[in-house]
Design a protein with these regions (language model features):
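Condensing-enzyme catalytic core mediating Claisen C-C bond formation in acyl metabolism
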Residues: 5-9, 32-37, 227-304, 312-313, ...
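A glycine- and small-residue-enriched flexible loop/hinge segment at structural boundaries
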Residues: 8, 40-95, 107, 114-116, ...
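Active-site pocket-shaping loop/turn-to-helix segments
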Residues: 13-16, 23, 66-84, 111, ...
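Glycine-/small-residue-rich "gating" segment that lines the acyl/pantetheine channel
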Residues: 37, 127-144, 185, 189, ...
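Active-site-proximal alpha-helical scaffold in enzymes
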Residues: 82-95, 153-157, 161-164, 170-205, ...
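Active-site-proximal gating segment of KS-fold condensing enzymes and close homologs
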Residues: 111-171, 213, 217-221, 324-339
Length: 432
């Protein structure tokens, strides 16, 4: 019996580039980025140490994308990002409402924040007129009963499933910056096991708030360096100093190849394998030897029935933090072992262009990897002017690269040592 082949037939993304993956793809190939000056609300200009981010401009969101019965105040920002990305992916796939009825929905979203603040803001048109906690208690009859659940971690998956009328499995993934990739990987495994034929998988997140960005800064993860301006995110560069936070979401439609072809869909790429591991090293830092990352990549390749030398591209986690980039480079070199193998590899870091989307990061990066397989074009790593001596691979610095990409890996590594790697391949009629 031939193994079930699983393909990507729909994609949707919300990033600082906007609300369409097609525009994001073209702008990233052109070497653009969406990082700009940012400061949290309620803080005096220049007082907050983190001054750059890659926010989504909600004012530019087309009105038709807000078509959800709960779009109002009970949907906070990250859930809105996820809903828009998921519905865009479904529209892109050409699936009808009837075809979605048994779909699985797997999503990842970040840790809840601002729950009380959002309740207060929901009672005022102007944030300056939001009531105090005492006034909230006195006006509790006016509070939307759903608001107490509006930021629960399973909220996003439920909103998507409810909105599309799916009665299939609904699963929330909570694994930090590896979340969206794990959602996609688990969806891939569910389809391969025969539990479902169709899944919508991805994630959404927003950490652009005073409390969350303060936490990232105190953790030593977020860069407060000012001298590079909007070129601050510089993965693998000697002067990298920390991540630049972004926000948004991404979702893909995965289905069996048999089902996709039967309904006339054209796959973007094929999902070949999935690997997941834990560093078991330190909650605030990756294993400097990259052992967990090596294991995740090796598991993905073994799952796909591939050897390391068959890989053409690695879409790196590439956070622009001193620890991650060195450890990930070492992990790649360890996996490929032979110098001639890793020297011909292409490696790219999408976060240099749209920042770190935290729990959602793996989803748009997975899409960009699929597009690289489809189009044989790889987005650049920006701002890599002075490579760290520990980071000595081909990172596609400064400009997009045109080269055949038959097999690729997309890596996502989360706080606490959570690692995922997804293996993708160029779609072709005959199986590998």
């Amino acid at each position: 019996m031939s193994p079930t082949r699983i393909v990507i037939t729909g994609m949707g993304a919300v990033t600082g580039f906007g609300f369409e993956w097609q525009s994001m793809w073209q702008r990233m190939l052109a070497g653009e980025h969406c990082i700009r000056p940012w400061q949290p609300e309620g803080v005096e200009a220049g007082a907050f140490p983190v001054r750059y981010a890659a926010p989504v401009d909600m004012r530019l969101m087309p009105a038709h994308l807000k078509d959800h019965p709960a779009w109002g105040l009970s949907l906070e920002k990250r859930t809105r990002f996820g809903w828009v990305a998921a519905t865009q992916a479904i529209a892109d796939s050409g699936l009808s409402p009837e075809q979605l009825r048994g779909a699985a929905v797997l999503s990842a979203s970040g840790a809840p924040a601002h729950r009380l603040q959002d309740m207060l803001l929901s009672l005022a048109d102007n944030p300056a007129q939001a009531p105090s906690w005492a006034q909230l208690m006195a006006r509790q009859a006016q509070v939307d009963p759903d608001s107490s659940l509006c930021q629960s971690n399973d909220r996003l998956a439920r909103v998507i499933a409810d909105g599309i009328g799916s009665e299939g499995p609904v699963i929330n993934i909570s694994s930090a910056c590896a979340g969206a990739s794990q959602a996609i990987g688990n969806a891939f495994q569910m389809i391969r096991r025969g539990e479902v034929e169709l899944a919508i998988a991805g994630g959404a997140d927003s950490v652009l708030s005073l409390d969350t960005m303060t936490a990232l800064y105190l953790l030593g993860a977020a860069s407060s360096e000012q001298r590079w301006g909007s070129e601050l995110c510089r993965p693998f560069d000697r002067h990298r100093s920390g991540l630049i936070a972004g926000e948004g979401g991404g979702f893909v439609v995965l289905e069996t190849l048999e089902r996709a072809l039967a309904r006339g869909a054209t796959p973007y790429a094929e999902v070949l394998g999935f690997g997941s591991s834990l560093d078991a090293y330190k909650i605030t830092a990756p294993d400097p030897q990259g052992r967990g990352a090596v294991l995740a990549m090796q598991m993905a390749l073994t799952d796909a029935g591939l050897e390391p030398q068959q890989v053409d591209l690695i879409n790196a986690h590439g956070t622009s933090t001193p620890l991650n980039d060195a450890a990930e480079t070492l992990a790649i070199k360890t996996l490929f072992a032979e110098r001639e193998h890793y020297r011909r590899l292409l490696v790219t870091a999408n976060k240099s262009q749209f920042g770190h989307l935290i729990a959602a990061a793996g989803a748009p990066e997975f899409m960009l990897t699929a597009l690289a397989c489809r189009d044989d074009r790889v987005t650049p790593t920006l701002n890599l002017h002075d490579a760290d001596e520990q980071c000595d691979l081909d990172y596609c610095a400064h400009q997009a690269v045109k080269r055949k990409v038959d097999v690729a890996l997309s890596n996502s590594f989360g706080f606490g040592g959570l690692n995922t790697s997804l293996a993708l391949g160029k779609y072709r009629e005959a199986p590998r």
